[in-house]
Design a protein with these regions (language model features):
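Metal-dependent enolase-superfamily TIM-barrel catalytic cores that perform enediolate-based chemistry
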Residues: 2-103, 107-108
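Shared catalytic-loop signature of beta/alpha-barrel
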Residues: 85, 91-94, 100-214
Length: 214
């Protein structure tokens, strides 16, 4: 928990007013959790570990910084529901990729926890998104301009989301070019929620691609 809290405070000190963390990748001692560790109903030991990490971060950043939990679809709907119910008292902004991205599973996690569900980096077209919207299975979409068909298609997806009162956080963890494209799109839609700024964007090999620092 102390490591998570320290890194969270560092991000806030750099000026970020929202942070996103995967609390279920690293084991307390060393190494990473494997897929089987995060599937099905979780043990009390894992639940206590997860809550301790979330609690430490919330206490470190205070009540006015948005906290997003990210699961990368490593958990399934059952374990995600357990985790969401456990930590929703810490004012979670939204729950990203809590399970394999299907409308039915996303709706299950949302209904069980009451948390806003974010999904989209593995959803690619209007025809896939529409089923999420119809079932109220997603509250924040995360289409990637580089994988969903470009600026025109992503704009259509965002406009469709607006009809269903669904917000947008463009998935942006690629090159400076994809970051710039995401920012241009976000300025042109009414349902923009938050801009994602990945640590990869600050890597020297990415910054060297740019004439101007960003």
């Amino acid at each position: 928990p102390d490591d998570y809290a320290r890194e969270a405070k560092k991000a806030v000190a750099e000026g970020y007013d929202a942070i996103k963390i995967d609390f279920f990748t690293f084991k307390p001692d060393e190494g990473n959790f494997n897929d089987n560790d995060r599937l099905g109903l979780l043990s009390p030991e894992y639940l206590q570990m997860y809550e301790a990490r979330v609690k430490a971060v919330r206490e470190a950043i205070g009540p006015n910084v948005d906290l997003i939990i990210e699961n990368h679809s490593f958990t399934d709907s059952q374990s995600a529901a357990q985790l969401g119910n456990l930590v929703k008292k810490y004012n979670i902004f939204y729950f990203e990729e809590p399970s394999t991205p299907t409308p039915q599973l996303s709706k299950f996690v949302h209904d069980e926890t009451g948390l806003p569900i974010a999904n989209g980096e593995r959803i690619y077209t209007r025809w896939q998104y529409i089923e999420y919207f119809k079932q109220n299975a997603i509250q924040v979409i995360q289409p990637d301009v580089g994988t969903c068909g470009g600026i025109t298609e992503i704009k259509k997806i965002c406009d469709m989301a607006h009809v269903f009162d669904v917000g947008v956080q463009v998935h942006a963890c690629g090159s400076p070019l994809s970051t710039a494209a995401a920012l241009h799109l976000e300025c042109a839609i009414p349902n923009f929620v938050i801009h994602e700024h990945h640590t990869y964007a600050l890597s020297p090999y990415n910054k060297e691609l740019c004439i101007h620092d960003y």
